Amino acid sequence: KSTSLAAMVDHRNQNSYGHIITIEDPVEFVHPHKNCIVTQREVGLDTEDWEAALKNTLRQAPDVILMGEIRDRETMDYAIAFAETGHLCLATLHANSANQAIDRIINFFPEDRRQQLLMDLSLNLRAMVSQRLLPMKDRKGRVPAVEVMLNSPLIADLVFKGNVPEIKD
């Protein structure tokens, strides 16, 4: 996951202009400035905690925000808010498939917030990438199995209606 996120940040850094902010615990890859200004914040070193880092992120006028791992509802709230304000938000979440990732996101929130959440996801989600390392036939290594789900009118409609299991079909 970390290597894939680092590759996405590096691609953006090489092929676009702007400001990339990473919030990590710990910083795993150092990104030098290329076409973008890259500000890397390590929780506990550069910022007191996740909450403080996330709260101060928009003050730095980023174009891209890498949030590391989403572990709780508060962090997910920030990710959605960043996406709603037009920022590209990259993060990881433990899940075995795109469907499971969407279910995990939904389950962070209480029932009374679900309809708004589904609408927000349907409008702001751009892609989900699910990765698993599987053993090779010879058992002498592992090979990645990658699922990429891009948002489309059909996916957005299924998410909006809460028909997440149908996405697999």
What is each residue range found by the language model?
Residues K1-D169:
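Short, flexible helix-loop junctions that flank or precede catalytic/ligand sites
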